Amino acid sequence: MAGDVGGRSCTDSELLLHPELLSQEFLLLTLEQKNIAVETDVRVNKDSLTDLYVQHAIPLPQRDLPKNRWGKMMEKKREQHEIKNETKRSSTVDGLRKRPLIVFDGSSTSTSIKVKKTENGDNDRLKPPPQASFTSNAFRKLSNSSSSVSPLILSSNLPVNNKTEHNNNDAKQNHDLTHRKSPSGPVKSPPLSPVGTTPVKLKRAAPKEEAEAMNNLKPPQAKRKIQHVTWP
């Protein structure tokens, strides 16, 4: 059973709370189902039927209790029940607001990836990798060797004839360069070492005469005298 109230559809439960909207026949039927005796005078008048319906058949807690000892006792029980319901609602709301404390251990993960915690984890991070230390030592050795003389070690896999020709050509080029730059005196070329046993020195040392000639070409700079300031 449904109806329209003020242009709004109402369900059966809403209509039961408003007996003035119900028909007289429906009120009589509900009262008879509740086994409530209805007099003939009350059946004719709808207002009396609605009052009887509100007093006995309307759904709780809208029912008006009688003003006797039993009615007062029921009102007290109703108030206590309402207070308990309010406390329960407030407790449930507080429980929903307070979020549980989530503790993540790492062991409760469902993934297959597991991180192992080591005792010296921080120290291991600070240590350089073994390759870095090896390369640093190699760079130091190379820098020390290149600062003095850079040796060129020839591979022994090449034929001997090619090695000797290459060494002779290098010696001739060095000899020609020294004669062009310093015609005043001959320059001793470094002795050639046997092939395959010792490295060949390709770096040519600067002659002493060239250094002296370069110093002579520089104009002599007169030393400036420092003039002391004297006050009268």
Curated annotation (Swiss-Prot):
The modification Phosphothreonine is found at T197, T198. GO terms for biological process: embryonic morphogenesis; tRNA splicing, via endonucleolytic cleavage and ligation. It is found in: Nucleus. Residues 116-127, 163-179 have a biased composition (Basic and acidic residues). Pfam families: Ashwin. The keyword Phosphoprotein applies. This is Ashwin. It comes from Homo sapiens. The gene is C2orf49.
